[in-house]
Amino acid sequence: MPAAPLTARAIGRIKPLLFVAGLLPFARWFWLGANDGLSANPVEFLTRSSGTWTLVCLLVTLAITPLRRLTGQPALVRLRRMCGLFAFFYGSLHFLAWVWWDRGLDPVSMLQDVGERPFITVGFAAFVLMAALAATSTQWAMRKLGKRWQTLHRAVYAIGLLAILHFWWHKAGKNDLQQPLLYGSVLALLLGWRVAAWWRRRGAAR
C-alpha cells in the first residue's frame, strides 16, 4: 500500500528539522574551532569543507525531484528551495574563503586567478550561476519571470557539472580522485534518471 501523501502541515514540521540539519556542518566548524580541531591548516580545512558541503547540498537539491516521483510524494518539492539555498550558503562561504584568504580581497589577483586556473574558472562560473538562481528563488521572481523562470533554473544541471569539474581538477593535481568519482557518480545517476524520464514522456507523447 502506498504511503499517504504528505500534507502541508507535515511539510511545515519537516522544514525546521531540515533547516537545523542544514546548519549542522556550520555549527560543527565552530565546535571544532573552539576545541582546536580544525587541523594543522584551518584555512585549508574550512575551504575544502565548505566546498564539499556545497556539493552535498546541491546533490540533495537535485535528488528531490526523483525522490518525490519515486515515492509518490509531490509535496517534497516544497523542500527543494531550502536545500538549494543551503547549497548557495555553503557555496558563498567557499567563495568567500577564496576571495578573502586565498586572494586577500585583491580584485586584480582574483581576475588573474579566474583567467589562468581552469578549476577556478569553472568554480567561479558555477558560483555566478548559483547566485542567479538564489536571487530568483522567490515567488515574486517566479511570477515576474513567468516561463523564463523554469528555463533559468534548469541551469542547476550546469552548476552540478561545473561543480564536479571544479572538484575533479582540484583533486587531479594531487592524484586524489576518489571523492570526485563518488560525487560525480551520484550526479550522473541523478541526471541519468532525468534523461530516462524525459525519454519515456517523449515516447508516450508519440
UniProtKB/Swiss-Prot annotation:
Keywords of this entry: Cell inner membrane, Cell membrane, Electron transport, Flavoprotein, FMN, Heme, Iron, Membrane, Metal-binding, Transmembrane, Transmembrane helix, Transport
InterPro entries, sorted: Fe3_Rdtase_TM_dom, MsrQ-like
Short name of any one Pfam family annotated for the protein: Ferric_reduct
Family matches, as PANTHER family: PROTEIN-METHIONINE-SULFOXIDE REDUCTASE HEME-BINDING SUBUNIT MSRQ
Localization in the cell: Cell inner membrane
GO MF assignments: electron transfer activity; FMN binding; heme binding; metal ion binding; oxidoreductase activity, acting on diphenols and related substances as donors
Cofactor(s) this protein requires: FMN; heme b
Cofactor, how bound (note): Binds 1 FMN per subunit.
Membrane topology: Multi-pass membrane protein
Name by which UniProt lists this protein: Protein-methionine-sulfoxide reductase heme-binding subunit MsrQ
Function field: Part of the MsrPQ system that repairs oxidized periplasmic proteins containing methionine sulfoxide residues (Met-O), using respiratory chain electrons. Thus protects these proteins from oxidative-stress damage caused by reactive species of oxygen and chlorine generated by the host defense mechanisms. MsrPQ is essential for the maintenance of envelope integrity under bleach stress, rescuing a wide series of structurally unrelated periplasmic proteins from methionine oxidation.
GO cellular component, one term: plasma membrane
Name of the gene encoding the protein in the UniProt record: msrQ
Domain of life of the native organism: Bacteria
Transmembrane annotation, as ranges: 14-34, 45-65, 82-102, 118-138, 149-169, 179-199
GO biological process terms, semicolon-separated: protein repair
Similarity comment text for this entry: Belongs to the MsrQ family.
Subunit-level organization: Heterodimer of a catalytic subunit (MsrP) and a heme-binding subunit (MsrQ).
Source organism of the structure: Bordetella pertussis (strain Tohama I / ATCC BAA-589 / NCTC 13251)
Primary location class: membrane
